């Protein structure tokens, strides 16, 4: 089993420091009991293949203190491949708590939910998760040749005086056998703040300040939905969010040489982010939304037609019936027995066959977005003591979407009760 690379003395020191100084920033280390959860990189037929990070179904969690960016960096560097961070805290600092998925949770176990993970009522770390992969040309032109952390600080100068750790994402620094480096597209900026409870609001304010500076945009999802974006990801402003900060597993002949992290230790924790001109921001968002609507409409129609054709061809049913089945999934999040689920890249399975085959919790692509968005962006949860019906929960695009099975519709909303 993977273990965190901390000596007993170091672990004890972290716990004692947290208990002795409740005004120190707190983070939580989550450990999986079922193996590595980090990304894996390997070379397949001359191309880099990425296996996405996995979720934690069972393991344990422990809240510890970090006394500044340097301390946080040492903690991150000590993480094993089966570990991740949450910037929220548990009620009891230093205690190692057994962890399980919500539907598997037994007495004495906690789940990675807001019921157990909360923002510290005091100093905490706020993550600015920066990714350039989906930036449109209009935004790329504004940031071309500049460090994105500097762009954010210039746009929101309040951040400049706060302690901060800037670290490249786990995908950065992957090198091919010929020595060429794979382009790094992401940054993790950990900003120390005075009150963790303000983090969700601060992230939204930073997001809107970026919009006001012309650094916001909309993208179109594979299913044709509009996704509001900026240089920072606001979905990480949730106390139970998993942050895959540990180094990835890199299989030879690939190697990894990531950029060196930057530490800014001076200054006081961030206590305030000034609001933007909200009327200006709303006008900019409305204009951007209108500009991209035609493309979204085309993509939505294309996606729907593609899904209908696949169901009609696979099961030899009339297109009208295939359209009904697909619209149930796309518009009502209901999965008919004769619908198709993508359970592997390019591999589709009849819903009824999937229900007959799968007995435990299983990762799969989002039923609407497919494997292009990721291989484990949704999870199938079987019926359990807490819920009498199975379901699929998608986390695509930072949203939680529940898909229910048509055969169990009459049982929806029921829960088991003790007698």
Residue ranges and their predicted role:
Residues 164-166, 224-227:
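A short glycine-rich, hydrophobically flanked beta-strand micro-motif that places a catalytic Asp/Glu
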Residues 214-222:
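Conserved short beta-strand edge segments in small beta-sheet-based binding/regulatory domains
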Residues 1-187, 192-213, 297-312, 316:
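Signature for HUH/AEP ssDNA processing cores
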């Amino acid at each position: 089993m993977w273990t965190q690379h901390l000596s007993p003395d170091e672990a004890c020191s972290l716990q004692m420091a947290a208990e002795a100084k409740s005004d120190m920033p707190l983070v939580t280390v989550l450990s999986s009991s079922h193996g590595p959860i980090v990304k894996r990189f390997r070379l397949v037929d001359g191309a880099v293949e990425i296996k996405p990070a996995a979720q934690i179904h069972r393991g344990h969690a422990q809240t510890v203190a970090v006394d500044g960016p340097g301390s946080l960096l040492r903690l991150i560097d000590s993480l094993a491949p089966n570990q991740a961070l949450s910037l929220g805290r548990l009620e009891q600092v230093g205690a190692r708590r057994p962890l399980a998925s919500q539907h598997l949770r037994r007495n004495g176990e906690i789940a990675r939910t807001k019921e157990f993970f909360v923002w510290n009522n005091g100093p905490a770390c706020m993550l600015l998760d920066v990714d350039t992969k989906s930036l449109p040309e209009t935004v790329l032109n504004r940031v071309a040749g500049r460090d994105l952390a500097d762009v954010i600080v210039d746009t929101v100068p309040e951040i400049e005086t706060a302690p901060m750790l800037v670290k490249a994402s786990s995908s950065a620094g992957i090198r091919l056998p010929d020595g060429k480096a794979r382009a790094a597209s992401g940054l993790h900026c950990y900003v120390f703040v005075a009150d963790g409870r303000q983090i969700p609001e601060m992230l939204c304010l930073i997001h809107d300040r970026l919009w006001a500076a012309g650094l916001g945009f909309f993208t179109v999802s594979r299913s044709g939905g509009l996704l509001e974006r900026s240089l920072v990801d606001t979905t990480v402003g949730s106390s139970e969010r998993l942050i895959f900060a540990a180094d990835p597993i890199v299989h030879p002949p690939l190697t990894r040489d990531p950029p060196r992290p930057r530490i800014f230790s001076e200054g006081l924790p961030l206590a305030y982010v000034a609001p933007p001109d909200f009327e200006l921001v709303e006008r900019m968002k409305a204009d951007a939304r209108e500009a991209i609507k035609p493309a979204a409409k085309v993509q939505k129609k294309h996606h729907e037609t593609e899904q209908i054709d696949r169901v009609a061809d696979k099961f030899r049913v009339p297109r009208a019936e295939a359209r009904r089945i697909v619209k149930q999934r796309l518009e009502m999040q209901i999965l008919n027995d004769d619908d198709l689920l993508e359970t592997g890249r390019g591999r589709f399975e009849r819903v009824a066959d999937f229900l007959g085959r799968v007995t435990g919790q299983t990762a799969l692509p989002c039923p609407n977005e497919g494997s292009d968005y990721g291989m484990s962006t949704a999870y199938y949860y079987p019926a359990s003591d807490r819920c009498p019906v199975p379901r699929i929960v998608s986390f695509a695009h930072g949203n939680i979407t529940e898909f229910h099975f048509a055969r169990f519709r009459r049982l929806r909303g029921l829960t088991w009760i003790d007698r």
